[in-house]
């Protein structure tokens, strides 16, 4: 009976370590996914700011040419 308890305790201990390692890997994968999302957001922000700058320069010129009040 004592050897059975030892074996079960050993299996439980090894299983706990295995689950802990899997959890760490999952967390690392989630962080990697989050990093790419952050990069996408940064790229979108850069793209939108560039687009707004171009629009702010072009729109007044277009309005001026359309209304012919330059």
From Swiss-Prot:
Disulfide bonds: 64-70
GO biological process: defense response to bacterium; defense response to fungus; killing of cells of another organism
One cellular component term from this protein's GO annotations in UniProt: extracellular region
Keywords recorded for this protein, A-Z: Amphibian defense peptide, Antibiotic, Antimicrobial, Cleavage on pair of basic residues, Cytolysis, Disulfide bond, Fungicide, Hemolysis, Secreted, Signal
Signal peptide residue numbers: 1-22
Subcellular location: Secreted
Major site of localization recorded for this protein: secreted
Tissues expressing this chain: Expressed by the skin glands.
UniProt key word Disulfide bond: yes
Propeptide cleavage-removed residue intervals: 23-44
InterPro entries, alphabetized: Antimicrobial_frog_1, Frog_antimicrobial_propeptide
Family per record: Belongs to the frog skin active peptide (FSAP) family. Brevinin subfamily.
Entry function: Antimicrobial peptide active against a variety of Gram-positive and some Gram-negative bacterial strains. Has antifungal activity against a slime mold isolate. Has hemolytic activity against human erythrocytes.
UniProt-recorded name of the protein: Brevinin-1CG3
Organism: Amolops chunganensis (Chungan torrent frog)
């Amino acid at each position: 009976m004592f050897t059975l308890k030892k074996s079960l305790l050993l299996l439980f201990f090894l299983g706990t370590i295995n689950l802990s390692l899997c959890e760490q890997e999952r967390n690392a994968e989630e962080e990697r996914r989050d990093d790419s999302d952050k990069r996408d957001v940064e790229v979108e922000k850069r793209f939108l700011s560039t687009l707004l700058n171009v629009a702010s320069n072009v729109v007044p010129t277009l309005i001026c040419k359309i209304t012919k009040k330059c």
